[in-house]
């Protein structure tokens, strides 16, 4: 079984999602192996623009099974919204989308803890002015 890999070796925004969308009909499996909901792949399907953050770009293609792998970070709130936004297209997610049991989750508590941690840094770190004195 041959495998082709599409990697972005810059800072993102290389158009990987669009390339996958163009090539998806040639593949049985489209896998997203890393990244999180901060990524965004803008695709056009049936004349409508869609921005996918977690769901792989091959989801609109009938042949491809889409896989969310171990290294992907899933925000359940964003993921649920993506699924709901795609409901009008009658995509059978039970057959077309597989999610690794080892994929990571971003929960609301993580966001709260992250915000609290950042807020503490604002008050405990010396300012550049203090360092230069």
Protein language model regions, located:
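Single conserved hydrophobic/aromatic residue that forms the stacking wall/gate
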Residues: 123-133
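Non-transmembrane, aqueous-exposed alpha-helical and coiled segments at domain scale
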Residues: 1-125
């Amino acid at each position: 079984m041959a495998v082709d890999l599409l990697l972005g070796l810059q800072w993102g925004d290389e158009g990987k999602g669009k390339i996958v969308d163009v090539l998806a009909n040639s593949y049985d499996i489209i896998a997203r192996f890393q990244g999180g909901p901060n990524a965004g792949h803008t695709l056009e399907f049936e004349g409508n623009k869609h921005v996918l953050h977690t769901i792989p770009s091959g989801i609109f293609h009938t042949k491809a099974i889409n896989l969310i792998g171990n290294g992907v970070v899933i925000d359940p709130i964003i993921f649920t919204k993506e699924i709901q936004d795609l409901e009008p297209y009658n995509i059978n997610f039970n057959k077309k989308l597989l999610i690794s049991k080892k994929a990571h989750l971003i929960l609301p508590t993580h966001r709260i803890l992250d915000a609290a941690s950042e807020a503490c840094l604002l008050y405990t770190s010396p300012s550049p002015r203090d360092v230069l004195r």
